[in-house]
Regions:
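Phosphate-coordination loops involved in phosphoryl transfer and adenosine-cofactor binding
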Residues: 3-6, 93, 139
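Short, well-ordered alpha-helices that flank and scaffold nucleotide-derived cofactor binding pockets
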Residues: 17, 21-25, 47, 81, ...
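Short, hydrophobic beta-strand segments that form beta-sheet elements in well-ordered domains
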Residues: 33-36, 96-99, 144-145
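Internal alpha-helical scaffold of NAD(P)-dependent oxidoreductase catalytic cores
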Residues: 41-48, 113, 117, 132-224, ...
Length: 287
């Protein structure tokens, strides 16, 4: 890169704040203008990043080389339309990307119509707290999709801040993102059910975090070292059908939705332990 690219950010949540801070602090981009749902949020992000001017409206944002739209999926299209309206007054097209793992770059079509290069970037990372995220981002896989020229620039920018970039096929994005949901988001739901179950079973509240940590750490370590098929344990994996049936019924009495999850997960656990895959034989042959 010959010079720092100017960067504008629309959406100062955890993802936008983290990426803006990394791009600024690594000397990759010069953060210029920041816009969010409230002016205060944009101002707080500017302070955290150490650069940038908070804008009260998208219309107040100056032209920039790169635009990051780190907004909820439901807002990407409308924000792109608002930016395209403003961009009519800009001297030349720019490059814009959104951070949705689900939506394709074509969601930014109002900008594409103006000659902008567009892409989507999905860092495969749990953005919980910007301070921790900035410190832990190095080595994060980043899925890229969109225009080749935009992908080329983003690969350069993200690699410079520690990202490990790979390409995602446009038509595969929904399934790709669903896999990430299974890997990360649903894990939190399952852990919450486990904690609630221990509490309902009378386990002392002070002991629950220790039980939780012991099981979770061991499971994660085994998964990373051995892979899912060899790491799977429990009554379903062992084929203890009587235990599974009784336990499933009891769980359903306590928590109907959790009972349904227990039954379905038990089927998949048994299949994984015996065949090495959660897919049914018919599904596996079709694939």
């Amino acid at each position: 890169m010959q010079r720092m690219k100017s960067l504008n950010v629309i959406g100062c949540g955890r993802v936008g704040t983290t990426l803006a801070a990394l791009l600024q602090r690594h000397g990759v981009c010069e953060v210029q203008d920041l816009y969010s749902t409230t002016l205060q949020t944009a101002q707080e992000t500017a302070r955290f990043v150490g650069a940038g001017t908070a804008a009260a409206r998208i219309a107040d944002m100056r032209p920039a080389d790169v635009w990051m739209l780190s907004v909820p999926d439901s807002q990407v299209a409308s924000v792109a339309a608002a930016l395209a309206k403003q961009a009519l007054a800009y001297p030349r097209p720019s490059m814009a990307f959104h951070c949705s793992g689900f939506l394709p770059a074509s969601t930014l079509k109002p900008l594409q119509a103006l000659g902008w290069q567009t892409a989507s970037v999905h860092p495969v990372f749990n953005f919980a707290d910007p301070v921790r995220c900035v410190a832990q981002f190095n080595g994060t896989p980043c899925g890229l999709e969109g225009d080749e020229s935009a992908i080329s620039l983003l690969r350069e920018l993200l690699t410079a801040i520690g990202g490990d970039c790979f390409s995602v096929q446009t038509g595969s994005k929904p399934l790709y993102h669903a896999a990430a949901v299974f890997s990360s988001n649903f894990m939190a739901v399952l852990q919450a059910i486990a904690r609630e179950g221990w509490s309902a079973a009378g386990v002392p509240e002070a002991l629950i975090p220790r039980i939780h940590e012991s099981l979770l750490r061991g499971s994660v370590e085994n998964l990373l070292v051995m892979g899912p098929a060899k790491a799977i344990t429990g009554p379903a994996a062992r084929g203890d059908t009587a235990v599974v049936a009784i336990q499933g019924a009891l769980v359903s009495q306590w928590h109907p939705e959790a009972g349904e999850i227990y039954r379905e997960m038990s089927v998949l656990a048994r299949r994984l332990s015996t065949t090495g895959s959660t897919a049914s034989p018919t599904e596996a042959r079709a694939a």
